[in-house]
Design a protein with these regions (language model features):
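Predominantly a Rossmann-like dinucleotide-binding segment in NAD(P)-dependent oxidoreductases
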Residues: 122-192, 202
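C-terminal helix-rich "cap/oligomerization" subdomain common to oxidoreductases
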Residues: 65-72, 288-323
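N-terminal Rossmann-like dinucleotide-binding module
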Residues: 1-43
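Active-site loop of classical SDR/Rossmann-like NAD(P)-dependent oxidoreductases
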Residues: 15, 37-38, 277-292
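Contiguous beta-strand/loop segments that form the cofactor/metal-binding neighborhood of enzyme cores
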Residues: 170-256, 292-298, 318-319
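Short amphipathic alpha-helix with an adjacent loop that forms part of the alpha/beta core around
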Residues: 52-64, 106-107
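Active-site regions of enzymes building and remodeling cell-envelope glycoconjugates
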Residues: 42-54, 110-113
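Beta-strand-loop-alpha-helix segment that lines the small-molecule cofactor/substrate pocket
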Residues: 67-73, 77-122
């Protein structure tokens, strides 16, 4: 089984470690961070190496038997990927939002790289897709809202390096790939409207970080994504409007800052305001199922094309959004 080097010691790194620790068969897990320390109390007992090459040399690791899992701000993604390439490490997992072109994959045909899209593995999304297929619902509009109070994290610059992170780069990447997955292949993808508002708390100002909204057209369907990072309300839901008065709402499980569950997930289907289906979810460990599939695939000889296609599809629309 391949060993794992997690790059980055923030919340994302901890969540990935937590998922890997649930696997029945997994190699050794290491952490590297250029700061050589960790601000995350949950991984205080782990040795933090200052670089990937130090991790390899100090532990006599074989680069062919390594998966590098990148959990850093996005500005650092390609620097770390290039380090991996120079060290002949071909198996990489990278957090969102990762953008790549076809030319990049042509240049590195042996590079197995997967972007974390954990909500694709959500029980809530699986149930929604199942109901759409079973009932042949025709989608007219998708609205997603991933909002939360991120004020303390933003003040402490979590998920940021030297460059400020814009609102569109935090929750909205999840919302984009979810809508694309539900809609399937579209011939036309157009940006109708986009807006980001600044983060202003006391004397702290972060440009285009506080609030974001995007309106997109996928063929004849409208998609609206919204994310407010300075609200006191925690919202993580998707609403799908279909023909004949059908509205599907998926509400994801909500957690507090210490990852304690505060609300179960739910899928509700209404028809002209009458509930025709309802199901509650007490468990939805989508990060575990995402990383489990990735780890198992990267331990096999070949990686499926679907993972590259997912990155290219995401890059096609997200690259235009952040221009």
């Amino acid at each position: 089984m391949k060993d794992i080097i997690i790059v980055g010691t923030s919340k994302a790194g901890f969540l990935h470690l937590k998922s890997y620790n649930k696997l029945s068969n997994v190699g050794k897990i290491f952490f590297t961070d250029i700061k050589e320390n960790t601000s995350n109390k949950n991984i205080k007992n782990k040795k933090i190496y200052k670089s990937i090459i130090d991790t390899l040399s100090q532990n006599n690791l074989n680069s062919n038997n390594i998966i590098v899992d990148i959990c850093t701000p996005k500005e650092e993604f390609y620097n770390i990927i290039n380090q991996c390439i120079s060290l002949d490490i071909n198996n990489i997992i990278v957090e969102k939002p990762f953008i790549a072109s076809k030319d990049f994959f042509y240049k590195y045909p042996n590079l197995n790289i997967l972007m974390v899209q954990n909500y694709l593995y959500s029980n809530i999304i699986s149930e929604i897709k199942k109901k759409i297929e079973e009932n042949n619902f025709n989608i007219r509009l998708i609205y997603t809202n991933f909002s939360k109070n991120r004020i303390n994290d933003s003040i402490n610059r979590r998920g940021m390096s030297k460059k400020n992170t814009r609102n569109f780069e935090i929750e909205i990447p999840h919302q984009i790939y979810l809508a694309e997955d539900i809609l399937g292949k579209s011939n036309k993808k157009e940006i109708v409207f986009k807006d980001q508002k600044d983060f202003i708390i006391d004397n702290i100002y972060i440009e285009k970080h506080g609030y974001g909204k995007i309106i997109l057209e996928y063929d004849d369907k409208l998609v609206i994504h919204e994310s407010d990072l300075v609200t006191n309300n925690t919202i993580k839901e998707i609403t799908i409007v279909c023909d004949e008065g059908v509205v599907i709402k998926g509400q994801f499980i909500l957690y507090d800052k210490d990852l304690n569950k505060i609300k179960n997930g739910k899928v509700i289907i209404n028809k002209y305001q009458n509930i025709i289906f309802q199901k509650e979810f007490e468990e939805d460990d989508n990060m575990y199922y995402c990383l489990k599939e990735y780890y198992e695939n990267l331990n096999n000889t070949g990686i499926q094309k679907k993972y590259r296609n997912r990155i290219l599809e995401f890059s096609n629309i997200f690259g235009r959004i952040i221009e």
